[in-house]
Amino acid sequence: MKNNIKYQLGRNIKIERIRKDITQEEFAEMIDMSLSYVSKLEQGLTSPTAIALFKMSKVLKIQMEKFFEGIKIS
């Protein structure tokens, strides 16, 4: 279950980034994180920190809740 949550969260981050036509490289620079970190997030290999989520939501101009759409915890 935990891995599924990370995967879905990463997928949502990637979808929102692509909607804004921002490359991973540009996104990493904009949120002051490494390209490797962004890649791992989008693959569901790591979980974002609260600070990273905050930065991503500001850069993408969306509410943080958008990253959690479609994630079900049972």
Regions found by a protein language model. Name each.
Residues M1-R19:
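A short, Lys/Arg-rich alpha-helix, primarily the initiator
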Residues I51-K66:
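DNA major-groove recognition helix of helix-turn-helix/homeodomain DNA-binding modules
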